[in-house]
């Protein structure tokens, strides 16, 4: 089919993943009030999976409406811990609070990807990863925050697994690409089946 591919995301890591896989694409940032949308979804008792999926679809639709014929990839990732969704930390103090809450406990990352064409969703997937943080010391936590802030403010949970954040964990169950925010294997498989990516 060879439709043009667009990424509706400002995430550097998502763009790098597609680029490293040899995918030809362009980036267009969607203008979406994620905080308000997430709050409305949670008020309607949406599940974490539904929140991630809905936000990914809204982002993809927004860009798709302006780019007829293009395959627009929208993504979102949420972190669920003991029934609560954690957002990106706004301050270093908030990052410390999040990491103290996650320390020596399990949480889940849900990474949604929705592809829209001509304003309509045509494919979707949600990757789920379960992670166990180790019982790291307060001294390590302080040093970690000094070394990684403000970079970790870009990520839910206040860590980047592709960087020093990997040292916070004792166990990870699931797909590495989903941890990074884009379930690549499923997306590439679908694009290949469609003929938009050579297989």
Describe the role of every protein-language-model region.
Residues 1-71, 139, 146, 185-186, ...:
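N-terminal polybasic phosphate/anion-binding patch
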Residues 24-35, 114-120, 154-166:
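Mobile beta-alpha loop/short-helix "lid" or hinge segments that flank ligand
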């Amino acid at each position: 089919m060879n439709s043009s591919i667009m990424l509706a995301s400002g995430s550097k890591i998502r763009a790098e993943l597609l680029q490293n896989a040899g995918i030809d694409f362009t980036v267009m940032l969607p203008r979406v009030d994620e905080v308000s949308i997430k709050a409305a979804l949670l008020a309607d008792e949406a599940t974490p999976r539904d929140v991630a999926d809905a936000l990914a679809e809204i982002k993809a639709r927004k860009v798709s409406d302006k780019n007829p014929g293009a395959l627009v990839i929208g993504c979102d990732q949420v972190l669920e811990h003991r029934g609560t969704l954690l957002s990106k930390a706004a301050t270093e103090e908030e990052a410390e609070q999040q990491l103290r809450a996650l320390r020596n406990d399990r949480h889940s990352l849900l990474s949604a990807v929705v592809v829209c064409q001509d304003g309509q969703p045509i494919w979707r997937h949600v990757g789920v990863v379960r992670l166990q943080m180790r019982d790291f010391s307060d001294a390590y936590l302080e040093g970690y925050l000094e070394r990684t802030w403000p970079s970790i403010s870009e990520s839910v949970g206040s860590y980047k697994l592709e960087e020093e954040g990997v040292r916070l964990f004792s166990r990870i169950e699931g797909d590495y690409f989903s941890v990074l925010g884009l379930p690549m294997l499923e997306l590439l498989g679908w694009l290949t089946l469609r003929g938009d990516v050579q297989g």
